[in-house]
Design a protein with these regions (language model features):
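Cysteine-centric segments in proteins
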Residues: 1-80
Length: 80
């Protein structure tokens, strides 16, 4: 199966240290998904192209890669 970049809105907390912590994903139709836990974050290349900060997150019990690429957020998704 082919992976795609799915750009999403993200609600983020920025700590006084400058660290960003994603809290929620927001879909175009208004649905919001709480990010239950951020397991790690580091600079990585995405399988779908691009390079940025990869946040390995638990969202509704599933492990997902959420990327911050310059000033936009995307998920690696099987649906465009």
């Amino acid at each position: 199966m082919q992976l795609y970049k799915k750009y999403v809105d993200v609600v983020v907390m920025q700590r006084k240290t400058g660290e960003l912590r994603p809290l929620y994903l927001c879909w175009n139709d208004g649905r919001e998904y709480k990010i239950d836990k951020v397991l790690s974050h580091s600079r990585k290349e995405s399988c779908v192209g691009g390079y940025g900060i990869r946040y390995v997150c638990i969202i509704q019990g599933r492990c997902r890669n959420l990327f911050l690429e310059k000033d936009r957020w995307f998920l690696e998704s099987y649906q465009p």
